[in-house]
A protein has these predicted regions:
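Positively charged, small/polar-rich N-terminal and surface patches that mediate targeting and assembly
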Residues: 2-136
Length: 136
């Protein structure tokens, strides 16, 4: 919330009123299988996504872990290697971004990953101080 003092009168302005409707940005986060990264990156470039952040992560879900044999001994691997891919996109690109990630990352097997969407309040480019869409 924002309070504004004008001519000795205090006004309350909902923070949403400062943004034009539809001008918000979203953080699309996807956890995918590592070998699908190039396909996902190329697909996102085709729909206009110009920047990504990628982090190597480990996790498990329904896929659980698996047993590996190393030098004659069995080891249980509980956390499986995945990649977390993140992109900040304008509202208009959210659905095409999600559709592209699904199309490019899907193998049809357990462990294909997850996608979630988070609202971004503000983005600032450190070098120039630009903010909002211009910073993406």
């Amino acid at each position: 919330m924002l309070f504004l003092l004008l001519c000795n009168n205090l006004y309350y302005i909902p923070i949403q009123a400062l943004f034009k409707k539809g001008s918000t940005m979203k953080l699309i986060t996807a956890v995918i299988k590592p070998f699908k990264l190039d396909e996902v990156r190329e697909g996102l470039a085709e729909v206009g996504i110009t920047g990504l952040t990628m982090t190597e992560v480990k996790g498990f879900g329904r896929q659980k872990g698996h047993t590996e044999l190393y030098r004659g001994a069995e080891y249980v691997v509980d956390f499986l290697p995945k990649l977390k891919v993140e992109a900040i996109v304008d509202d208009e690109l959210v659905e095409s971004t999600i559709d592209t990630i699904i199309k490019c990352a899907k193998t049809g097997k357990i462990g294909d990953g997850k996608i979630w969407v988070t609202t971004i309040d503000q983005v600032i480019r450190i070098r120039t101080g630009e903010s909002g869409k211009e910073a993406v």
